[in-house]
Amino acid sequence: MLDTIALDLVPSDHQVHVALFRGVQNAGFLHSQLLARNAAFEYAFVDASVVASRNQILAAAFRALAVKLSDNLRTPNVHSELVTSLSPSNNIADAYRRFGISPATKDLVVVKITYPSDSAATPVSRDDIEKHLAENVHGTPAGFSDDELAVSTDWTKVKKYYKLNGLPWLDAIKDEQERKLQMDELVLGAMALRGV
């Protein structure tokens, strides 16, 4: 299941393709392809355990695209920029370690950002992306929705990485759904304020 999303405020030929996989059996292989900079595996592979919501991924994709469009990438490509955009700090290595794929990753969010470039006037198609993922990600596809992501979210990690521990007002919220909504908003705020 691959969702294709056109973000507001970016050119219409720049698209974001997102898939969620559960029970990934070959995370080590996928991780090694990223480390080898294999162009066929130029995706943002995000450990789903640190994803609080769809908005978190889409905000990171928007930021990565904005940086790409302004020619200010700090990382090798727009996909690695997306992974670092998830982090509340500017430490690139820390962002890769916390938010990117590792050999131990079980649930995986895969993002492919497509746009015309000097080397390819026509970006890779949605069907080609879906086929490549089906052949190379050994996991069970799931829908890219907040409900599906919630199954994978490790709130202990999210709270630690975004420094949400020890907030008495947050801990005092009795309604679990409301508490998660507030944490999601705090995560988005931390991402937006990075580097300010």
Residue ranges and their predicted role:
Residues M1-H17, R22-A44, Y162-V196:
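Charge-rich, low-complexity segments
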Residues L2-L9, V16, V24-F99:
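Positively charged, polar, low-complexity stretches
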Residues H14-H17, H79, H132, H138:
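Histidine (H) residue identity feature
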